[in-house]
Amino acid sequence: MSIKVTQEKLPASRVGLQIEVSGEQSRQVYERTLTRLSREVRFPGFRPGKVPRPVLIQRLGETALKANAIEDLVQQSLESAIAQESIPAIGNYQLSSDFETLVAAFQPGESFSFEASVDVQPTATLAQYTGLTVEVAEVPFDANRVDNVLAEQQKQMATLVPVEGRNAAIGDVAVIDFQGILVESGEEIPGGSGTDFQIEVEEDRFIPGFISGIVGMAIEETRTVDATFPETYAQEEVAGKAAQFTITLKELKTRDLPELDDAFAQEASQYETIEELKTALTERFQAEHESEVKASKRDAILTALADQLDVEIPESLLQREISAMINETASRLSGQGMDVRKLFTEEVLERLRENSKDEAEQRLRRTIALGELAKVTETQVDDEAVKARAAELLSNYPRPQEIDRDRLNTVVREELLEDKLLEWFEANNSVTFVAPKAAETEVDAASATVETTATETAEEAPEAPKAKKGKKKA
């Protein structure tokens, strides 16, 4: 289809198109539309494809026929215009002309003009990619982590024995009955009651005031305890509100901890001695720390690159990235056993899309910045390197025949290219580690991610954590 096309550059990586179609082409499309509809519609007394044209026009109406023809003509004309002008289009087009006006003006056999716009691949430039100074927040290594993990494992493997001759203290395990009300209204708290409820008497295990109210109680004692739900509590109907709990202490237990010896190691893990277990934990935590350091450095470098990027991200690309983020979150939550169909209601999805815009844009800016760095530095990945890495990954997978090899090669190539680009950046810029700022360690409630926004709808009413049993393999 030969057509006349006038292009206009629009903001946000869009191109406006003024398209003119000849009278002969408008006639041909109209005729094809009538032929298609005559095959598709079903009228009593006529076989499919045998509906006479006058009957078709009378039954459907001239306006409806023109509207169908224009839809076909616009779609075909846009596809031809994009191909003819070599426009790097992404996403769907948007009709700028008023559709009803087009229908009223359309005459088969006469020239037809309309305006539309389409998103295109963004043009990006890096203002600077050498000589930059990048500060990376240090990731401290917790030297006590092995001891803390073993201590927690001791608790899980401990034997609970009844407490005699004293009142409840921090570190105990209590069995309680409790019932809560909101002070202001006197109404019962949804989910705020329980019978024979086992709770660890540990600070910060429940809402402020609850645990401190249990401390000092005697068995069979009943107390009224004042507590307050945090302002940031997941259930909005009780967040920030004062509550009263009537608590009866029915049983009190303490933990008889096992010794940290070889027998402990054999029961808690696949290792024969406690020293082997400690060594394995140390090596694992050191490897995790190295990964965290690498991730911190990657994040800082990509942020620095994105800050140097000049680009207008098209809306269709942004929405596509948001959809990808939501799908990733849905996949993770589904893997955790959550019913995402119930979780992702229409209201939740709308909120997710809105809350995800900033993160999606930053992800796109990082991806585009890396792509531009690869162009200007002419960095590529050797096919043999991709093949070797893919083979290594497949060797560690129990069912390699189930893996999509093309997809695997694509992912491997992207990862190897990113590694090479990050190495190049480090060699040509100043990348230094600095102590993390205090503000960076605080939780910013306003910056909710896709996953936190999604999962907060699944939060239940306050529930005290129960004492854990069983063993955990190291």
Curated annotation (Swiss-Prot):
<dbReference type="InterPro" id="IPR037041">
    <property type="entry name" value="Trigger_fac_C_sf"/>
</dbReference>
<dbReference type="GO" id="GO:0043022">
    <property type="term" value="F:ribosome binding"/>
</dbReference>
<keyword id="KW-0132">Cell division</keyword>
<comment type="function">
    <text>Involved in protein export. Acts as a chaperone by maintaining the newly synthesized protein in an open conformation. Functions as a peptidyl-prolyl cis-trans isomerase.</text>
</comment>
<dbReference type="GO" id="GO:0015031">
    <property type="term" value="P:protein transport"/>
</dbReference>
<feature type="domain" description="PPIase FKBP-type">
    <location>
        <begin position="171"/>
        <end position="258"/>
    </location>
</feature>
<dbReference type="GO" id="GO:0051083">
    <property type="term" value="P:'de novo' cotranslational protein folding"/>
</dbReference>
<dbReference type="Pfam" id="PF05698">
    <property type="entry name" value="Trigger_C"/>
</dbReference>
<keyword id="KW-0963">Cytoplasm</keyword>
<dbReference type="InterPro" id="IPR008881">
    <property type="entry name" value="Trigger_fac_ribosome-bd_bac"/>
</dbReference>
<feature type="compositionally biased region" description="Low complexity">
    <location>
        <begin position="444"/>
        <end position="456"/>
    </location>
</feature>
<dbReference type="InterPro" id="IPR008880">
    <property type="entry name" value="Trigger_fac_C"/>
</dbReference>
<dbReference type="GO" id="GO:0051301">
    <property type="term" value="P:cell division"/>
</dbReference>
<dbReference type="GO" id="GO:0005737">
    <property type="term" value="C:cytoplasm"/>
</dbReference>
<dbReference type="GO" id="GO:0061077">
    <property type="term" value="P:chaperone-mediated protein folding"/>
</dbReference>
<dbReference type="InterPro" id="IPR046357">
    <property type="entry name" value="PPIase_dom_sf"/>
</dbReference>
<dbReference type="InterPro" id="IPR027304">
    <property type="entry name" value="Trigger_fact/SurA_dom_sf"/>
</dbReference>
<dbReference type="InterPro" id="IPR036611">
    <property type="entry name" value="Trigger_fac_ribosome-bd_sf"/>
</dbReference>
<dbReference type="Pfam" id="PF00254">
    <property type="entry name" value="FKBP_C"/>
</dbReference>
<keyword id="KW-0697">Rotamase</keyword>
<dbReference type="GO" id="GO:0003755">
    <property type="term" value="F:peptidyl-prolyl cis-trans isomerase activity"/>
</dbReference>
<keyword id="KW-0413">Isomerase</keyword>
<comment type="similarity">
    <text>Belongs to the FKBP-type PPIase family. Tig subfamily.</text>
</comment>
<keyword id="KW-0143">Chaperone</keyword>
<dbReference type="Pfam" id="PF05697">
    <property type="entry name" value="Trigger_N"/>
</dbReference>
<protein>
    <recommendedName>
        <fullName>Trigger factor</fullName>
        <ecNumber>5.2.1.8</ecNumber>
    </recommendedName>
</protein>
<dbReference type="GO" id="GO:0044183">
    <property type="term" value="F:protein folding chaperone"/>
</dbReference>
<dbReference type="InterPro" id="IPR001179">
    <property type="entry name" value="PPIase_FKBP_dom"/>
</dbReference>
<keyword id="KW-0131">Cell cycle</keyword>
<dbReference type="InterPro" id="IPR005215">
    <property type="entry name" value="Trig_fac"/>
</dbReference>
<feature type="region of interest" description="Disordered">
    <location>
        <begin position="441"/>
        <end position="474"/>
    </location>
</feature>
<dbReference type="GO" id="GO:0043335">
    <property type="term" value="P:protein unfolding"/>
</dbReference>
